[in-house]
Amino acid sequence: MNFSNNGARKIFNGADMERIKCREHLIKSDVLFPPPPRPWVPTAPLEESRPSCIFSVMSYNVLSSSYATPKMYGYCPKEYLNWEVRGQNIMSEIFQYNADIICLQEVEMEQFDVFFLPNLQSMEYEGIFAPKSRALTMSELNRNLVDGCAIFWKIDKFSLDKSKLVEYKTLAVQDGADSSVMLNRVWSRDNVGRLAVLKTTAAAWTHGPPVDPNDIEQLIIVANTHLHWDPRFPDVKTIQSMMLTREIVAMVKSVRSSPERILKFSEIKVLLCGDFNSLMDSGVFQFLSTGQLPLSHSEFEGFDYINAIVNMMGGEYSDRITHPLNLSSACIPEIMPYTNYTYRFKAMIDYIFHSSSNMVCLGVYGPILQEWFDMFGVMGCPHPFVPSNHFPLIAAFQLTA
């Protein structure tokens, strides 16, 4: 039969072909085995000759239910996108690694209150949360679906000293009221950061307590953020990272002095976790890991941020913006080549940064072995055995006294 003149003739476009491939993948994926355990990769030797605090940190974008749709992830069976199933799988993943500090991104407001917080409290955690800025303007029903950032900590090892919400939208107005590019590009994004100042407890120390009682309660500033997603706006992500480091520096300065003890700036520990939506060759990574970024960086090309950045720096002009936090990334691509793994995109965009002068990274978990993806034709995540489109980053650290 000749279909050349048939009005019902179907012309398959790229999206149609992708759906066909996804359907074929699902048919072939009826029988699967879970991935093997992720390998532990030591990065520094353990110091055992003096009192130390050893703790683990997880950073994990859990994928908001609002984004986990069959249209977006057609290669994942629908039942495994359902929150009732996926949420339990995410919690199993969190419990499996049993981290002492947990930073989660894309946590919905209602899910924090009714799912994440009660489940983690049952495992002796406490936590705080901040939704994206748009939640303030929405009805209660819609507000519950807004995602944000959460920080949890084990109460036997840490106590909360203070916390702070960082709203990039608000800071864009403060820093760039006379900058059209700041208002048009940064102000319109509602990403947030969350800061928590944690104090180590006596139970957190091994090999005996510190000789100096003042060393028992060491301060760690934990920052968690989720930067703007769109690759067309690298300048926005870089500005957001600059705003966040400025707020962290301000927090360091505010906790340095106490009635009992004056601390040096370098004695305050910093952990910066999150989904930065930025590759390692980005301005975000360069700025955070090296402590500086020239204003001539290509990501600023064509945009006049000069006045806004001068305001961010306290009114002093320089040809570069800097921060004094001395941060290092716990993970590198040689260890963890990707933290986001979807059909169209696979790369490292999540990071755990830490103070490199006073905190030693002992090791990190590597990736799910590529052989597993290849063996079962796994096109991307989420997946029946991988509940998010991101993998959790997990690192261990040691403080000494």
Where do the PLM segments sit?
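Conserved phosphate-coordination/catalytic loops
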Residues: 80-85, 187-190, 235-239, 386
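Catalytic metal-binding/acid-base residues of hydrolase active sites
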Residues: 63, 108, 228, 276-279
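N-terminal, active-site-proximal structural segment of metallo-dependent hydrolase catalytic domains
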Residues: 1-148, 241-242, 246, 250, ...
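Active-site flanking residues adjacent to catalytic metal/cofactor-binding acidic residues
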Residues: 60, 104-105, 225, 273-275
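Metal-dependent phosphoester-hydrolase catalytic domains
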Residues: 2-44, 188, 199-208, 232, ...
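Generic recognition of short, well-ordered alpha-helical segments
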Residues: 114-115, 235-239, 283
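Structured beta-strand-rich core segments of catalytic domains in phosphoester-bond hydrolases
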Residues: 25-54, 101-229, 233, 313, ...
